Amino acid sequence: KIMNGIGGSGDFARNAYLSIFTTPSVAKDGLISSIVPQVSHVDSTEHDVRILVTEQGVADLRGKSPSQRARCIIENCAHPDYKQLLWDYLKLSEGKSCHTPMSLRNAFKMHIAYAETGDMRNTQFES
């Protein structure tokens, strides 16, 4: 009988006293940022992540709102090549939605830039 998906990471993270997730800040020699505004699939939701660690630093996300979490992750974990892009997205998305900042027009622009140009740094957000 399967209790959770393959590996059980969801149950493991949800039941952890302090869940810590690690990732490199970039992939493919810097062409892809691991920190992005939105993803098409998640294994662990925002409610399961307490601490995020990259080689850039540590983001303690406990007790923070979605906007505060985004700021903490950008400031502490995003690669310097992508920080300004992520700040730009956050600025565009705040005020357009209620509790969770999101711009549907721009949410996947970084992914689209990579698909079209091979480099997420070529992202152009729309106002």
Spans of model-derived segments:
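Conserved phosphate- and dinucleotide-binding cores of soluble alpha/beta proteins
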Residues: 1-127
